[in-house]
């Protein structure tokens, strides 16, 4: 919100088990979720955007839907000329399908590329995902893809695609906070009034590298060591994909906007 107006509509997100359904119910749920996002994006473009440049930002299931949105609504339309960039974080983009998904949208390879896709999936150093497969959307429809195949990635500390280890002393990692919040908030269909905020993590500092085989973003250092001590943590930093890089991400948004205009 330092560089942009934010449009963040709610949508009917598919449940976690939609990704494991052996019938079509899971894919139908994901199609329904996507339809909300496409409708919201159309409303934004037609009523709120006023022909200005825009950024698409999404994480996890949201990133999966953003792949589809960019393919259908942006990549092959005049809107691509107004796309500053798209941060589609925390969901795999297999390298072999990139050209099918985004034939007219480049992969980012520097801090000030525009009209491009930026993606990463973060894990601790040496971690390999034990979940073998996941659903993936392609223009011809849904497929089941191996999680182990090489994915498109950018290192958010260097904004390059090489496998060097990088740190960013100016980065600030954050943690979500909430007052009077309990588990029922997750189940409520209404806003419960819990006051949510963010704060800086007590420990700062780590470095990261793109794994040359998988494309996963591996991280190590003091903050990562602290996260490893969390109960039930298995080595996948998926819940922290954005929080870890909050400071460098905010700066990069400024850099790409400056480059675009």
Name each model feature, range by range.
Residues 58-66:
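Gly/Ala-rich beta-loop-alpha elbow adjacent to hydrolase catalytic centers
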């Amino acid at each position: 919100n330092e560089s942009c107006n934010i449009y963040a509509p709610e949508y009917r997100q598919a449940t976690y088990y939609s990704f494991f359904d052996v019938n079509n119910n899971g894919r139908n749920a994901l199609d329904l979720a996507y339809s909300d996002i496409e409708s919201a994006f159309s409303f934004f473009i037609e009523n709120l955007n006023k022909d200005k440049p825009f950024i698409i930002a999404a994480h996890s299931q949201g990133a999966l839907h953003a792949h589809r949105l960019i393919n259908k609504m942006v990549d092959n339309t005049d809107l691509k000329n107004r796309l500053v960039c798209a941060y589609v974080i925390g969901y795999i983009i297999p390298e072999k399908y990139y050209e099918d998904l985004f034939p007219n949208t480049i992969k980012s390879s520097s801090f000030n590329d525009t009209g491009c896709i930026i993606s990463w999936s973060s894990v601790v150093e040496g971690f390999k995902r034990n979940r073998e497969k996941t659903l993936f959307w392609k223009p011809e429809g849904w497929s089941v893809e191996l999680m182990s195949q090489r994915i498109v990635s950018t290192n958010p500390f260097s904004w390059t695609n090489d496998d060097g280890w990088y740190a960013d002393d100016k980065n600030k990692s954050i943690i979500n906070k909430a007052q009077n919040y309990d588990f029922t908030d997750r189940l409520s269909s209404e806003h419960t009034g819990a006051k949510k905020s963010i704060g800086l993590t007590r420990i700062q500092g780590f470095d990261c590298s793109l794994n040359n085989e998988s494309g996963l973003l591996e991280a190590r250092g003091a903050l990562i060591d602290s996260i490893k001590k969390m109960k039930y943590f298995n080595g996948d930093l998926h819940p922290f994909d954005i929080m870890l890089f909050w400071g460098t991400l905010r700066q990069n948004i400024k850099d790409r906007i400056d480059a675009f205009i």
